[in-house]
């Protein structure tokens, strides 16, 4: 276990496990855990980008010192964190009492393993809206929890923070053209890589009978062949991006342009 300082940027630490061959041969990065001080987190998240980066990178988030604030404060904090990183589970902790199963072997950087643990990854957990430029493409995006939406069931109940760390989802029930997607992702990473904290997905590629597992940290992006599509399984793609003020429309429309 590597414990960093409270002001550390997790990005360079995570990248070391992929860029340094000697380290990669001997060590596997399992996950990034973020401990949040409920008493001071709101101010820290507002004042320090490093704190927001730590939320964006996290695979698991622990909320401590909840006994020092009221339930409304904790609820608002957890809502804010969820807006920044909806894929990371949050858990209140009492004097560091955490089950080891919530700390080790989370497989945050092994999406193939995550598919075994969570086979519903491709299924929509929120409603999706068609993209504005092509309503027939069946490509779309999901609202991150707490994100503004015109539907009456999504009226916000918490103060809205304009944090620079945000997440968005692309999904489609059309196959990607491999060459187009490779070119687009390569260009996107060159331009926006420093702002792309974590991204991952399961892809349906034209001409392949297997899922493609895709993930990355900043400019480091990789993919592996996953399991075959099961008979009768609905094929599709889902990509989750977490980053610093990423141009959502550029990503979504660009990905649509890579579909068959």
Q: What residues fall within each predicted segment?
A:
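C-terminal accessory "lid"/substrate-recognition subdomains
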Residues: 57-63, 68-230, 234-237, 244-260
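Short N-terminal micro-motifs specific to bacterial/archaeal maturation
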Residues: 1-4, 172, 242
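Phosphate/Mg2+-binding loops and adjacent switch elements
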Residues: 1-102
């Amino acid at each position: 276990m590597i414990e960093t300082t409270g002001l550390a940027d997790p990005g360079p630490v995570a990248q070391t496990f992929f860029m340094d061959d000697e380290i990669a041969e001997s060590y596997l990065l399992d996950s990034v855990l973020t401990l949040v001080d409920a008493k001071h987190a709101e101010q820290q998240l507002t004042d320090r980008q490093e704190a927001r980066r730590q939320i964006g990178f996290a695979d698991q988030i622990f909320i401590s010192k909840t006994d020092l604030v009221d339930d409304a404060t904790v609820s608002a904090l957890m809502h804010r964190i969820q807006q920044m990183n909806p894929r990371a589970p949050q858990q209140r902790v009492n004097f560091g009492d955490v089950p080891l199963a919530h700390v080790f072997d989370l497989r945050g950087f092994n999406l193939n393993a995550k598919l075994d643990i969570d086979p519903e990854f491709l299924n929509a957990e929120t409603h999706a809206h068609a993209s504005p430029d092509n309503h027939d493409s069946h490509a779309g995006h999901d609202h991150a929890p707490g994100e503004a939406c015109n539907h009456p069931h999504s009226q916000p109940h918490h103060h809205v923070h304009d944090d620079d760390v945000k997440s968005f989802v692309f999904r489609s029930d059309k196959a990607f053209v491999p060459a187009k997607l490779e070119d687009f992702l390569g260009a996107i990473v060159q331009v926006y890589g420093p702002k792309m904290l974590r991204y991952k997905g399961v892809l349906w590629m034209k001409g392949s009978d297997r899922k493609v597992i895709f993930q990355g940290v900043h400019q480091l992006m990789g993919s592996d062949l996953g399991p075959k599509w099961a008979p009768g399984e609905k094929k599709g793609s889902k990509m989750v991006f977490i980053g610093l003020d990423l141009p959502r429309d550029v990503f979504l429309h660009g990905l649509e342009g890579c579909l068959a």
